[in-house]
Amino acid sequence: MLTADDKKLIQATWDKVQGHQEDFGAEALQRMFITYPPTKTYFPHFDLSPGSDQVRGHGKKVVNALGNAVKSMDNLSQALSELSNLHAYNLRVDPVNFKLLSQCFQVVLAVHLGKEYTPEVHAAFDKFLSAVAAVLAEKYR
């Protein structure tokens, strides 16, 4: 459960993500594809080369969805219901992949935010992204 302090840290950090959604998202996806190659199987129709328009476009979608989740931290289930349905019923993405992408996104945040990505921010984002992953996996039960 996110505390009031967690929510403040997440919101303040998210303000620094604004304007970089496409870059951060593409970088997180590229890290995931390199670190966890089996994740590429969910993107057979994509050009997965670094900097491809498809990876950048999907990265932007992912980070924008996270932005919507930040705005709806108190009601993630409702905010992410459509995405949960899409990934569970249409795309049939193994839910473990949400955690893998979360890890990669946290690395991107740490790289770009440097000292501003404090242990407290890391802990808050870890809780937040775990909650997002859990909500996205709800429809699999």
Swiss-Prot record:
Pfam families: Globin. The keyword Amino-acid biosynthesis does not apply. Involved in oxygen transport from the lung to the various peripheral tissues. Keywords: Heme, Iron, Metal-binding, Oxygen transport, Transport. One of its GO terms (biological process) is hydrogen peroxide catabolic process. Belongs to the globin family. It comes from Aegypius monachus. PANTHER family: HEMOGLOBIN FAMILY MEMBER, HEMOGLOBIN SUBUNIT ZETA. One of its GO terms (molecular function) is heme binding. Heterotetramer of two alpha-D chains and two beta chains. This is Hemoglobin subunit alpha-D. SUPFAM superfamilies: Globin-like. The keyword RNA-binding does not apply. Red blood cells. Residues 1-141 form the Globin domain. InterPro entries: Globin, Globin-like_sf, Globin/Proto, Hemoglobin_a-typ, Hemoglobin_oxygen_transport. Heme b binds at residues 58, 87. GO terms for cellular component: blood microparticle; haptoglobin-hemoglobin complex; hemoglobin complex.
